[in-house]
């Protein structure tokens, strides 16, 4: 039984004061594993959120950890959120919307992030597209989907939210991906291999 389970069961537990930041994450990670549910961990700012993610990964490298960050602008600012911030937030929300089944997972966020409104779950599902090697999909269909969901077509992909198309090759820098992904089409079928452009490594 984890410490959090003991608290819910009314078991007498000792109180520990002045524990260093991150010590509580050991129990939170255990709780996520034991309950096979999504556990939300809220911290004060992005610096602590990043540190919490690193600590949780150290405690359980196989646990799925999602970072839900806040927008980096105010509602009435004249500038839009940066692509990096928008992509990370969208990736986390899309992962939660696509996989609602109970599972061991830790969501790390900030007080500012959870105070901001999110897109409806159905809208996030509709804006997501899963592609697999060998899948049949027309390039025009993929192109229309990317444009409809805010991707920018460019000659060479450099930032998240961009894609490039040259013949049967499509390079996409999607939210949540550490590197751009290359899709090779044979007719309307995706090739078996993906290429991470910056590393020039075929998987």
Whereabouts are the PLM-identified features?
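A short, hydrophobic C-terminal helix/tail in secreted or cell-surface proteins
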Residues: 199-203
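ASCE RecA-like P-loop NTPase motor cores
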Residues: 1-198
